[in-house]
Each structure stands twice: as structure tokens, then as C-alpha cells.
Amino acid sequence: MRPWPAGSADRNLPLVMMPHGGPASRDHAGFDWWAQAMASRGYLVFQPQFRGSEGFGQELLEAGYGEYGRKMQTDLSDAVEYLAGAGLVDRERVCIVGASYGGYAALAGVTVQQDIYRCAVAVAPVSDLVADLARDRREGGRDRYNTSLRYWMRFLGVDDHNDPILATLSPARLADRADAPILLIHGRADTVVPYEQSEFMEEALSRAGKEVKMVTLDGEDHYLSFPATRLRMLEETIAFLEEHNPPR
């Protein structure tokens, strides 16, 4: 958790659930400019090391295999319930924010899951797993040496890129289930998660009559490498949170 918001009573705080990217990655105890920006506005920011995270032993990493969109997702909502039960956060004032895999988790939190979050912010997210695996297969080849495809299929728990379960875990294909406002932010020059993944989500949400805002960062890559676009992302994120989940 990020430091307690200044001036808070340390109880019943508004929460930002912030899963990291990867998913085979981790958060560190050092300075995090994005998390700290939200904490400075009065939010308790929780960065969970959910199953599938690396750096805590092989058992935790492998516990994520086959759990993408499943137990990797409920690890987050279980943390919400724990923090609320301990009186640290207000169960009715919770949003989810993330980038890359964390962006997928943010979208899944209000589509695959429901009745948990008041809003979702997804930066450079995968929204359609079917389309994303098809791209990986097309660009990386179909054989066993396509390490990217094997990585994703291991976490997704599928043996075929056309497995029907992928549609049931794809937020863009579940847009009619969205139960909270969604902010999408994506760099147009992203070569890791293509910009079209946010376009898929925005178009599906709009067709379903759901509340969505999309912010395009022209010339920006997956990692938000430019200070000006990082600043814009922070401003858009905080404004969206304060609109839909006011800290005070």
C-alpha cells in the first residue's frame, strides 16, 4: 500500500486497486510516480502481488497458470473485501486502475466481474484476447518456438488460440456487462499492445450504451516514455477518479 493519504483518519478510505502489468512481473517498494500521484489526492492505493507475479518464488508464479481472468482476477476482489472488512477502506468507494496486463484486469473488473468497482482506468490494455492471440500467432509464427504465444496460452490455460473460453474472458466481447464508467488511455505508437485493442473496447462500449472515455496519446509507446504524455495520463486519471470516486 502507498503511504496513508495526508490528513486522513486512516479508516474507511477511498481505494484504488492497482494491479501491475505482466502478469509475470511485480511491484517494488520504491517510488512509483503513478501510484504516488493518486495517493497524494487522498486515495489509498493498493498494489497486490497476485498469483502469477514473479519475485516471490516459483509457486506463486505458477499459481497463475490457467488463472488469467479467473483467480488472478478474484485475488484483487478478495483484497478489496479484506481491506473493507478490516475497516481500512470504504467498500462503496473503490476503483481499479492499471496498465498493460493491469489494464486488462481493470476492464475485467467491471465486465468479467461485476458489482465491485465504481470506475475503471485502463492504460494500454488488452481487451480482446481472441484478436490478441491471433496477432501473436500471425506475427510470431505457429510453431513451438513462438515464446510469446506459449507465454500467453500458459497463463490463459488454453491449448488453442481459438479456444471458446477466450471470448468469455475478453472485456470487449462482454461490453454489455460493464457496470461502471471506463477511461481508456492508449499510445497510438504502441507496438506491445496495439492501439486497436482500446479501439475495440471503446467501440463495443459505445454500441452497448455504456459510459466510456478514450484518450489517445499521439506518438506514444507502450511505456509512456515521454514526460508530456505521462503528465497527461496522470491528469486524465486523477480527473476521472475524482469525478467518479471523490476522495473526500
Predicted regions and their residues:
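Short beta-strand element of the alpha/beta-hydrolase
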Residues: 10-21
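Short beta-strand segments enriched for Tyr within beta-sheet-rich domains
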Residues: 13, 43, 117-118
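Short N-terminal helix/helix-N-cap motif within the alpha/beta-hydrolase-1
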Residues: 26-28, 196
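Short beta-strand-to-loop junctions in surface cap/lid or active-site-entrance loops
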Residues: 1-11, 170-175
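Short amphipathic alpha-helix adjacent to the substrate-entry channel of hydrolases
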Residues: 29-48
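Short hydrophobic segments within beta-strands
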Residues: 1, 18-19, 97, 185
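Serine-hydrolase catalytic-loop signature spanning alpha/beta hydrolases and amidase-signature enzymes
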Residues: 21-25, 45
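Active-site-proximal cap/loop segments of hydrolase catalytic domains
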Residues: 48-248
